[in-house]
Every structure is written in C-alpha cells, then in structure tokens.
C-alpha cells in the first residue's frame, strides 16, 4: 500500500515538468489525482487541454485514478473550479500542491506592468486562491496538506527576475500564514525550492558565462528528483512538519533558514542619523548578507 493510499491530491501545473512527476508519483503512491494544467506557453499564453489529459490518461493506464482540469489558478473563480473538480470526482480533497507557474524575465528598468502582473498573479495569487479554496474543506475535515513551490530566486536572488523573485518569496510568507491559521485543524503547509531542468528553465537566457554554467548544471537535474519530497510532505508521516522551506537539488535535500534577528544595537538616549552613521555599519557589517545570486551561493556540483 502506498503512502498516499485513499487520499485525493490536486496538483496545479501538472501537465509537464515537476508537476507532472509529482502527479505520477502521487498516483503510484495510491492517491487519486486532479491533474490541473491550463496548457499554456512558458509565458502563460494560450491553452491546450491535451497537456493535462495526457497525464490523466497515463495515470489511468497505470491503474490509478485521475481527473483533468484546465482552469487557470490566477483567478478566484478558476481556483474554486480546480478544487471543486476534486470534490466532483472524488468527494474530498486532502492535498494541494501549488506548482503552476510561468516566467517573464526582464531586467528591472525594462519590465512592463503586464510582465509583473502576469507572474505575480500566476504564482502568488494562484497559490493563495487555491489554498483559500482548499482551506475551507481542510477546516471542515480537520486535516490537509499544502505544498507550495518557492525558488532560490526569491530566497537568495537572481538578476532579471524581480517579478518571479517577489512572487516566490511571497509564497514563503503565504505558506507560514497558512501554517499558523490552519494548525488547529491538523493542516500542514510547507515550501519546496526545486532545482530541475524544465521548459521554464530552458527559457533562461545565457548571455554570459555564469548564466551558461548555471543552465548546464540545471540540465543535469531531473524533475523526477523533486517528486519524492512532495509525496512525503503530503503523507501522514509528515504530520509534524509545517512552515518549513526545503530545497531539492538532484539527490540532495536542503532545509533553508528563515529570517531571525542575528544582531542588535541599542542606545538608551535614542538614535540619531549621526549616531547610526558612526555605529551601525561597524557593528553589524560582519553579519550583513552578501549581494550574491543563487548560483554563486549554491555553487557546488549537483549529486546526479
């Protein structure tokens, strides 16, 4: 018997890449799966129902149970329909994986309002809308699992991804809020920052040696490596794990730190700009975080 036997899981953006691998593994672990995918391009344009249908059919061919959904996570109504799909087909929902995403990379001073809004709405709004819709049912049944996808673009930083980084770090805060609001109902909420070669990653430009090197490393990492952690976090075995941020990089799993006070200074008479000029940098500089990008911080070769 699989670790998810009898559970119903909704996996957004599961027609391709990481989401597809999660949906397939959850089905093999016994879950009934709603395969949600709009079927759009990497930038979110267009739609194609065959993308979700192919994964649904693959699950059924292997003896599992699945339903396909083609709604967009980026609207309140779309998210409601995604969760309702689970209820219509399988009468409940136990697991929500917020995986759907798009990329519209652009350097800050060239990014358009549309490029900002599109990414924020898909990642951050989408994660909230779907979590909100699922939370109503989790509260009633006093159980549930929320698994969100963040990124080192938000946790650490990347050039040309102000929209994506903002959305992905916002998802960490959303996950923590979900964990706090729903802990009394036995609901957990965790984040995964994946490292894997997907069609979204393939769109990253390689205009300099550092970008090219990063892309070459990512090309060695399979989306399938991310699925086991998602399945574990969805299971009863992970009932005591909540509000954490994990990373998966090939055969390696990380636990990320979260913001906490690392140093403080005080003045009994109060601070002035002049006092801060004299004290703040000399006292705190050794604790400052460097301005690096994720590829500089996580620079060792992946364990393929």
Q: Where do the protein language model's features map onto the residues?
A:
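Substrate-binding pocket helix/loop in short-chain dehydrogenase/reductase
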Residues: 59, 107-108, 115-120
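Active-site helix of classical SDR
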Residues: 131, 167, 175
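C-terminal helical subdomain
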Residues: 212-304
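Residue(s) in the substrate-gating loop at a strand-loop-helix junction
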Residues: 151
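Canonical Rossmann dinucleotide-binding motif of NAD(H)/NADP(H)-dependent dehydrogenases/reductases
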Residues: 3-35
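The beta1-alpha1 cofactor-binding region of Rossmann-like NAD(H)/NADP(H)-dependent oxidoreductases
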Residues: 49, 70-81, 113
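A glycine-rich helix->loop->beta "capping" turn
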Residues: 5, 62-65, 85-98, 104, ...
């Amino acid at each position: 018997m699989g670790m998810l036997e009898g559970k119903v899981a909704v996996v957004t953006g599961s027609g391709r890449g990481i989401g597809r691998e999660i949906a397939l593994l959850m089905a093999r672990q016994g879950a009934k799966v709603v395969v949600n995918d709009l079927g759009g391009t990497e930038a979110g344009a267009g739609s194609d129902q065959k993308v979700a249908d192919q994964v649904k059919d693959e699950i059924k061919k292997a003896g599992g149970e699945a339903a396909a959904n083609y709604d967009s996570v980026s609207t309140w109504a779309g998210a409601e329909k995604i969760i309702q799909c689970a209820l219509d087909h399988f009468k409940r929902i136990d697991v929500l994986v917020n995986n759907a995403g798009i990329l519209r990379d652009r350097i800050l001073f060239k990014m358009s309002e549309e490029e900002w809004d599109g990414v924020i709405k898909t990642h951050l709004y989408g994660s909230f809308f779907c979590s909100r819709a699922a939370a109503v049912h989790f509260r009633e049944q006093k159980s549930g699992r929320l698994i969100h996808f963040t990124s080192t673009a938000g946790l650490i930083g990347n050039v040309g991804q102000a929209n994506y980084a903002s959305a992905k770090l916002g998802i960490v805060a959303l996950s923590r809020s979900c964990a706090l609001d729903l802990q009394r109902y036995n609901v957990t909420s965790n984040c995964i920052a994946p490292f894997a070669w997907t069609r979204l990653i393939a769109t990253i430009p390689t205009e300099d040696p550092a970008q090219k090197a990063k892309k070459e490393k990512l090309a060695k990492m399979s989306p399938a490596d991310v699925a086991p952690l998602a399945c574990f976090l969805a299971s009863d075995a992970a009932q005591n794990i909540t509000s954490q941020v994990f990373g998966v990089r090939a055969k390696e799993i990380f636990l990320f730190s979260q913001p906490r006070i690392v140093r403080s200074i005080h003045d009994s008479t109060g601070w002035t700009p002049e006092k801060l000029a004299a004290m703040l940098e000399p006292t705190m500089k050794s604790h400052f975080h460097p301005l690096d990008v994720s590829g500089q911080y996580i620079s060792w070769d992946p364990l393929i």
